[in-house]
């Protein structure tokens, strides 16, 4: 398992554990606590995870995914800029 996969796995596990359990008297389904979801991620890691999930159409509300799928990520733009100089 690569480091990105293992960190992604840990994040998904954390999100699963963040789900509020349903008690017999509670109305509606279990929901993620919006205050804690994806705010713990650092910029670089969030960029990698969100880029992957946006391409698959997952986690749009957490990642602020662009509408276009062929948008070049900031990471690639930085790499191209540094090679051009």
From Swiss-Prot:
Residues 1-24 form the signal peptide. The modification 4-carboxyglutamate is found at residue 47. One of its GO terms (cellular component) is extracellular region. Contains 2 disulfide bonds. It is found in: Secreted. Expressed by the venom duct. Residues 25-38, 68-85 form a propeptide. Its main location: secreted. GO terms for molecular function: toxin activity. Keywords: Amidation, Cleavage on pair of basic residues, Disulfide bond, Gamma-carboxyglutamic acid, Neurotoxin, Secreted, Signal, Toxin. Disulfide bonds: none annotated. The modification Aspartic acid 1-amide is found at residue 67. The cysteine framework is XIV (C-C-C-C). This is Scratcher peptide. It comes from Conus geographus (Geography cone).
